């Protein structure tokens, strides 16, 4: 007998998922509609079911302006989550970066690489985003970008957290990012 538990809903198109059993949180990435890619944090996911807002709230837009009032009523894409009772993303990208995988790169589980598989290096969507969270893991305190000029489809990290294997879609190749000892 396997027991399953729903811990959240209101996700549009999840791409990356990281669960920390040690610190009890889930960090997820998801594609928004035309813009509005999100990084979502679910702290203590087993205490209460959280709603991240889709399709009521999104920082993206509908792909077409030719929607009926009925569709817009069901999916208004309000530009606030909190105002409508939903969890706000800890970060959203507008324009979209084509967000993909998320991996933790340190033992404290406060630093992460997030892949981007968009189309424009100038929009910071062909490479890897680095984020650092505060100790409570509810806010990004540092964000930078590593341009690769490649669509980053997936990443995995070694057990010692010193090597990240990056799956590059543009050239169908692998890259290795290694942490240098100081």
Label each residue range with its predicted role.
Residues 156-182:
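Blade-level signature of beta-propeller repeat domains, shared across WD40, Kelch, NHL, RCC1
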């Amino acid at each position: 007998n396997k027991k399953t538990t729903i811990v959240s809903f209101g996700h549009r198109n999840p791409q990356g998922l990281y669960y920390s059993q040690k610190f009890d949180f889930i960090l997820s990435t998801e594609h928004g509609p035309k813009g509005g890619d999100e990084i979502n944090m679910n702290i203590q996911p087993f205490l209460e079911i959280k709603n991240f807002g889709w399709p009521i709230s999104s920082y993206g837009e509908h792909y077409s302006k030719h929607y009926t009032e009925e569709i817009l009523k069901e999916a208004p894409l309000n530009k606030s989550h909190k105002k409508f009772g939903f969890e706000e993303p800890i970060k959203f990208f507008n324009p979209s970066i084509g967000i993909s995988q998320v991996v933790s790169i340190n033992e404290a589980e406060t630093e992460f690489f997030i892949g981007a598989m968009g189309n424009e290096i100038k929009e910071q969507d062909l490479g890897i985003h680095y984020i650092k969270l505060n100790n409570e893991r509810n806010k990004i305190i540092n964000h930078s970008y590593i341009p690769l000029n490649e669509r980053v489809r997936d990443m995995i990290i070694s057990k010692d957290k010193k090597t990240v294997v990056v799956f590059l879609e543009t050239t169908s190749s692998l890259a290795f990012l290694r942490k240098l000892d100081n």
